[in-house]
């Protein structure tokens, strides 16, 4: 066989639903790569003969290979920090109190408007490096810290540039409807007009976004405003997604399902009717335990209902300066299990196959299947459950991206 590389002495957590074992596991396995794609995988005993003198062979020392991790919800590009608000919350202030006092998102908006692209790029690069060291091979990055046309475009340009200069694939999301900027404090409908009539066309003209998101909440955008933005995005041919049911149940998830959104994110206050709507539309539920933890929330997402209705559950970091300043997908695996009672297999599926579904890229990444992109990680673990069980010592040994060894 003519391959570019072969990995032996490994176990595979394929996350392929067609493999009946937990995690889609194949033990005592091998995997071969050709032209950036998975060319063969299976039990080592069935590995076809190949020229060991001309093809690089990597020995996994009994470790586990999983698909590359996918962080499907981040706000990774921002300037400044909000440590002062952390102190205020510990003294009793709520997330809503801080937001209504022009803190929260608005304070980060001010910092991002002042920062130039070079500064934002370097900050983003450092954060992307941190995720990459934990086995992340694809990441979604949202705008939303500009709230004016110039700064929203600036953030999205930086995200696109990161994708060009880093081995991690970057998917971009336009989140101009993240908060009401001070200039439109008493005219939120006017700001929605600006998003639809000026911001969105400018984003599309530069091909800066793969999707559009809205924060549908009582401190942000109502249902009517949310539908206007998402409908405009959908009409322009962009994927849509939604922050919804984080602080209250406004019915955003049902709206997102009706419009065919790829995902609804947060969903702590989602009810059974909303879960049923997601199930019927095939919309993913993105769980963000980092924000739940950092904001010290008590209302948990309806995990049992999501299971009952077969809604794909995704785990993501929600890395951002205000509600989840936690740049770690491995910690999300642990939090998803300890805080939300996911099984370790559900958690890993949420950072691989289901995360790919939330971004609309499941045909190419998210599981180890012949013909898919060769994005995978070798972990120094005895069982896949260890990835969720223990945190603090990074077990990621090797990362292959598009068939190339990028981290060793």
Curated annotation (Swiss-Prot):
Q: Name one GO cellular component term.
A: cytoplasm
GO: which molecular function terms?
imidazolonepropionase activity; iron ion binding; zinc ion binding
Residues where Fe(3+) binds: 73, 75, 243, 318
CC cofactor: Zn(2+); Fe(3+)
- The entry's keywords: Cytoplasm, Histidine metabolism, Hydrolase, Iron, Metal-binding, Zinc
SUPFAM superfamilies attached to this UniProt entry: Composite domain of metallo-dependent hydrolases (SSF51338), Metallo-dependent hydrolases (SSF51556)
User: Which InterPro entries has this protein been placed in?
Assistant: Amidohydro-rel, HutI, Metal-dep_hydrolase_composite, Metal_Hydrolase
Chief place where the protein resides = cytoplasm
Cellular location of this protein? Cytoplasm
Q: Which cysteines does the record link by disulfide bonds?
A: none
Domain of life of the native organism: Bacteria
Q: Which GO terms describe its biological process?
A: L-histidine catabolic process to glutamate and formamide; L-histidine catabolic process to glutamate and formate
Q: Specify which residues bind N-formimidoyl-L-glutamate according to the UniProt entry for this protein.
A: 145, 320, 322
Kindly list the positions annotated as binding 4-imidazolone-5-propanoate: 82, 145, 178, 246, 323
Tell me which family the UniProt entry assigns to this protein.
Belongs to the metallo-dependent hydrolases superfamily. HutI family.
**Which HAMAP family does the UniProt record give?**
HutI
Q: What is this protein called?
A: Imidazolonepropionase
Organism per entry:
Shewanella sp. (strain W3-18-1)
